[in-house]
């Protein structure tokens, strides 16, 4: 399993499009994408089918990590998004999501 965490340089409304474009190619990958634009912060967690099969749930992960950006969110087991009002917390939110993923994977 591979875990990728990155801040992306585009507006939050494009996170969903990118996630759904990449997901079919990433069976063994967990991705955490974050973006800050126009005073807004967004976080997305995308899990490949093999990762979901191991019991991970993107919605649970994004809800927990969103606390760092004073936000909330949700979604489906394979994809979830959160928005928040604290852009300066994005790095901590992405780290929290990565930590949760690795913990659930037994790393």
Segments and roles (model prediction):
Residues 2-107:
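Glycine-rich, acidic loop segments that terminate in or are immediately followed by a histidine
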């Amino acid at each position: 399993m591979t875990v990728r965490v990155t801040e992306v340089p585009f507006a939050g409304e494009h996170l969903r499009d990118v996630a759904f474009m990449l997901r079919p190619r990433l069976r063994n990958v967990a991705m955490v994408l974050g973006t800050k634009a126009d005073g807004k912060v967004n976080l997305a967690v995308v899990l490949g089918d093999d990762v979901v099969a191991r019991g991970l749930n993107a919605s649970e992960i994004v809800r927990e990590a969103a606390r760092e950006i004073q936000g909330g969110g949700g979604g489906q087991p394979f994809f979830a998004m959160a928005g928040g009002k604290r852009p300066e917390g994005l790095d901590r939110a992405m780290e929290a999501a990565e930590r949760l993923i690795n913990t659930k994977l037994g790393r």
